[in-house]
Design a protein with these regions (language model features):
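Low-complexity intrinsically disordered segments
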Residues: 1, 20-23
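Bacterial N-terminal signal peptides
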Residues: 10-19
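Flexible coil/turn and secondary-structure edge motifs
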Residues: 24-187
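Bacterial N-terminal signal peptides that target proteins for export
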Residues: 2-10
Length: 187
């Protein structure tokens, strides 16, 4: 009798587990640099199919960069996008990036200057590289580089646009991000 109960329990658990496994969401990552990560995170989290955006650093050689003057070395501020490819495609994400950065400025973005604020799109596969190259606007100076180690920034900078919305809005406005994007995109 005990063996039959164990078998029944095992069969029920196996059935439940197999049903749960079939509903697991597939997640992919996409990383890009577009100036201040507070802004890139805010612009990208609103997209359907994006489940999370993590602010951080990538694209350099400095080990363990930190958000302190001189401590992020040769890295760029970046956004790592976690998304469901069944809802949003890599191609749509790349189109979004080109629409929300100044793709004509390789020396920084908007009021922020220097390599740490310069734009870049990072790819994992040749297919991703080809998509990013094909979608690049005619005057784009945005480098398309192989993905490298991504270092998340401290928690206080994650979701900054939600946690410190007034400071974020002031920064974004005073930096001229939206007015430049409107001019660049013909709005």
């Amino acid at each position: 009798n005990m063996d039959m109960k164990n078998i029944a329990f095992f069969a029920a658990a196996l059935f439940l587990f197999s049903n749960m496994a079939s509903t697991v969401v597939t997640a992919e990552t996409f990383t890009y640099s577009g100036g201040c990560f507070w802004c890139t995170e805010a612009d990208t989290e609103k997209l359907d199919g994006v489940t999370e955006v993590i602010s951080g650093f990538t694209g350099g050689t400095t080990a363990s960069p930190r958000y302190e003057p001189g401590k992020w070395g040769d890295h760029r501020e970046a956004a790592q996008v976690i998304y469901d490819p069944d809802i949003i495609t890599y191609e749509k994400l790349v189109r979004h990036v080109y629409a929300t950065i100044d793709y004509e400025d390789g020396e920084g973005q908007f009021c922020d200057r220097g390599r740490s604020y310069s734009p870049a799109i990072y790819y994992k596969t040749d297919s991703e590289r080809l998509i990013a190259e094909r979608l690049a606007p005619k005057n784009s100076v945005v480098p398309i580089e192989p993905e490298s180690v991504f270092y998340p920034v401290r928690e206080e900078h994650q979701d900054f646009y939600k946690k410190r919305s007034l400071k974020y809005k002031y920064y974004r406005f005073s930096c001229g991000r939206d007015s430049r994007l409107d001019a660049l995109n013909g709005n």
